[in-house]
């Protein structure tokens, strides 16, 4: 029985109890949200080290960190270091997007070591293997693809990105309308190339019931990928993107009917004034399925700073109702991220998520900020560092820029506003 099936018959699972305790919500309320499909709890029965997290309505905004080998950098040990950095920085989930070296070993090591939710994009491995076996990705067979999907599910992957909405109809609509950046999703481009070469429908769409059978067997959550996500602002919210979203909404319904949890992936590159509309469309067309967004990035001109462009968009998206943010690192559009890039990406996404949780009024979010305000008023530097989203960086700045034992900070010194006002009000900062 999957998490969804259990919830639908009123059965509280251990995963639901764990998530409810962490989120400080009633388990009965959480179960109702899971039963309705508005919350997913990705829990593969073979991921034994997992500490489950819930994604969806009424819960804290979650953050995912991508890692994985490439053909240029196939070092598994380096990616496992990134895994630990991401976990230490507070990532709720990680995705192994490996395309180089021993892909199976990398994934299995990530699953074995990660207490966080683990996701993959199976088409990546299927494509790499087709290239090695046949000399061309377009020669991949339907069975090749589903063999990889089942293998990854059996290994313990909690959710998989599957670009089921890239259909012949959607691709034709893209061709007719035209785009500046065309298709930027790797999975979407692989499938489009395969479809056009073989003159066949997307196997993930044509054989969706087969996909559902595998997902139900292992309780793998489907993350319905946006293969037509906009890769630049000029392409945002166009016909192809929305047509794919309509199809994904229909596939969400079919997944729920089959007892399989599903969430929906979203853009991408979106100008600020279109973000709220994108969230509204997903929630409406996909019947409030949890929304997993890549950023979105709000400008195309900041390579090297795209963790910031994504955090700006992510905060607005999550405040409008998105549930899950995929981090973007400073290396986005430029190269494979370093350990430092991974940390920066996770922290930026967490800031965005927390800012959104404040706007949503989620339990606990406001108390965290109130505690920080009290510590600042009291000039309690140790408490401020403890409460910081990134205590390590806060501690470094405090030590580097201030004399040991200084009551105020080096920005204001004797002219500290907290101290001066506290003294005039007869309420010294140190005792606030």
Swiss-Prot record:
Pfam families referenced in this protein's UniProt entry, alphabetically: ThiC_Rad_SAM (PF01964)
Any single GO BP term: thiamine diphosphate biosynthetic process
Binding site for Zn(2+): 269, 333
Enzyme Commission (EC) number: 4.1.99.17
Residues that bind substrate: 66, 95, 124, 163, 185-187, 226-229, 265, 292
One cellular-component annotation, GO: cytosol
Residues that hold [4Fe-4S] cluster according to the record: 409, 412, 416
Keywords, comma-separated and alphabetical: 4Fe-4S, Iron, Iron-sulfur, Lyase, Metal-binding, S-adenosyl-L-methionine, Thiamine biosynthesis, Zinc
Principal EC category: lyase
InterPro entries in the record: ThiC (IPR037509), ThiC/Bza_core_dom (IPR038521), ThiC/BzaA/B (IPR002817)
Reaction(s) this enzyme catalyzes, per UniProt: 5-amino-1-(5-phospho-beta-D-ribosyl)imidazole + S-adenosyl-L-methionine = 4-amino-2-methyl-5-(phosphooxymethyl)pyrimidine + CO + 5'-deoxyadenosine + formate + L-methionine + 3 H(+)
Comment on bound cofactor: Binds 1 [4Fe-4S] cluster per subunit. The cluster is coordinated with 3 cysteines and an exchangeable S-adenosyl-L-methionine.
Cofactor(s) listed: [4Fe-4S] cluster
A GO molecular function held by the record: 4 iron, 4 sulfur cluster binding
Domain of life: Bacteria
PANTHER family: PHOSPHOMETHYLPYRIMIDINE SYNTHASE, CHLOROPLASTIC, THIAMINE BIOSYNTHESIS PROTEIN THIC
Family: Belongs to the ThiC family.
Main function: Catalyzes the synthesis of the hydroxymethylpyrimidine phosphate (HMP-P) moiety of thiamine from aminoimidazole ribotide (AIR) in a radical S-adenosyl-L-methionine (SAM)-dependent reaction.
Full protein name: Phosphomethylpyrimidine synthase
Species: Moorella thermoacetica (strain ATCC 39073 / JCM 9320)
């Amino acid at each position: 029985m999957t998490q969804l099936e259990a919830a639908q018959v009123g059965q509280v699972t251990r995963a639901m109890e764990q998530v409810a305790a962490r989120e400080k919500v009633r388990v009965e309320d959480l179960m109702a949200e899971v039963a309705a499909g508005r919350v997913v709890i990705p829990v593969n029965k073979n991921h034994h080290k997992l500490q489950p997290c819930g994604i969806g309505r009424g819960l804290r905004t979650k953050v995912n960190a991508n890692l994985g080998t490439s053909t240029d950098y196939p070092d598994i040990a380096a990616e496992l270091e990134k895994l630990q950095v991401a976990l230490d920085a507070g990532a709720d989930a990680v995705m192994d997007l490996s395309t180089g070296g021993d892909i199976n070993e990398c994934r299995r090591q990530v699953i074995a070591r990660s207490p966080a939710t683990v996701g993959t994009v199976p088409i990546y491995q299927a494509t790499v293997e087709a290239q090695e076996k046949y000399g061309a990705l377009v020669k991949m067979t339907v069975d090749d693809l589903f063999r990889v999907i089942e293998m990854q599910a059996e290994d313990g992957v909690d959710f998989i990105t599957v670009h089921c909405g890239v259909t012949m109809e959607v691709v034709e609509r893209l061709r007719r309308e035209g785009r500046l950046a065309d298709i930027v999703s790797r999975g979407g481009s692989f499938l489009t190339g395969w479809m056009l070469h073989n003159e066949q429908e997307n196997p993930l769409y044509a054989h969706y019931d087969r996909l559902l059978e595998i997902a139900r067997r292992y309780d793998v959550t489907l993350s319905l990928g946006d293969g037509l996500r906009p890769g630049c602002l000029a392409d945002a919210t166009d016909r192809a993107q929305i047509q794919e979203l309509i199809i994904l909404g229909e596939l969400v319904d079919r997944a729920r009917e089959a007892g399989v949890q599903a969430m929906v992936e979203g853009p991408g590159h979106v100008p600020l004034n279109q973000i709220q509309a994108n969230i509204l469309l997903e929630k409406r067309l996909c019947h409030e399925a949890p929304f997993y967004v890549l950023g979105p990035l709000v400008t195309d001109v900041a390579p090297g700073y795209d963790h910031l462009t994504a955090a700006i968009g992510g905060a607005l998206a999550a405040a409008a109702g998105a549930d899950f943010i995929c981090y973007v690192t400073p290396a986005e559009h430029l190269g494979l991220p370093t350990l430092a890039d991974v940390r920066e990406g996770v922290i930026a996404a967490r800031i965005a998520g927390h800012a959104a949780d404040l706007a949503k009024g989620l339990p606990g979010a406001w108390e965290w900020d109130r505690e920080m305000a009290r510590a600042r008023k009291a000039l309690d530097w140790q408490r401020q560092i403890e409460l910081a989203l990134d205590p390590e960086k806060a501690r470094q700045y405090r030590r580097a820029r201030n004399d040991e034992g200084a009551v105020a900070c080096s920005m204001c010194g004797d002219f500290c506003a907290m101290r001066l006002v506290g003294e005039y009000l007869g309420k010294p900062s140190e005792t606030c």
